[in-house]
Amino acid sequence: MKSTVDDIRRRFDADVERFSNMETGQSATVDAPLAMALIAEAAAATTPHARHVLAVGCGAGNYTLKLLEQLPNLDATLIDLSQPMLDRATERVGRATTGSVRAIQGDIREIELPDQGYDIVLAAAVLHHLRTDAEWRAIFAAFHRALRPGGSIWIFDLVESSIPAVQQLQWRRYGEYLTRLKDDGYRDHVFAYVEREDTPRPLLFQLDLLREVGFAQVDVLHKTVCFAAFGAVRG
């Protein structure tokens, strides 16, 4: 049985410091600093006149801070399950922008987003907690509605492969990365909480779904092993 929302919240409540490191990002995630930089640059390039960013699963605020290096002084709305994460993100983002900062603690599946309220949506290492195809469709459709025309969404996340044999290959290579990072025990620890907590979908599934809910342009910034950075622009 997969972790409940409360289980996930408690784990992140206790892990604020690890998610506050701008240099390493989340070390268990392959190429996290590169993905963070690519997403910030792509968001700025596609939505240069943005005024308001929505960060879903904002964690300690790293992705929002990286975006503010490219597009200074945006208004920011931050959403996270974890109140300690949200408190840290609000503090850090508040110091980095002259714009307004609004914090919302809760589950994105239960939060009603305003129509055309944002210019950029960031969703980093959060959507793999969605459970059913219906939830994925509903959330992607909500993101599309929440963006103003010309707005963009940028995602970095754990993804599956569409071909089972390739999934096994990528998972083996990810395990080798984790062992090199620390040791076999750390690999087994990460694999255990992914199995317990996460329900990722293939990159191709998500790209197709972005198109289906109405995004006009879809592209991939980076794909390595079982992680991908990608995005879409609303017409």
Positions of PLM-derived features:
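A short beta-strand submotif of the Rossmann-like class I SAM-dependent methyltransferase core
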Residues: 123-127
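C-terminal alpha-helical "lid/dimerization" subdomain adjacent to the S-adenosyl-L-methionine
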Residues: 156-213
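A short glycine-rich, Lys/Arg-flanked "PGG" loop and its adjoining helix->strand segment in the class I
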Residues: 137-149
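Conserved class I S-adenosyl-L-methionine
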Residues: 1-47, 66
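Class I SAM-dependent methyltransferase SAM/SAH-binding core
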Residues: 52-110
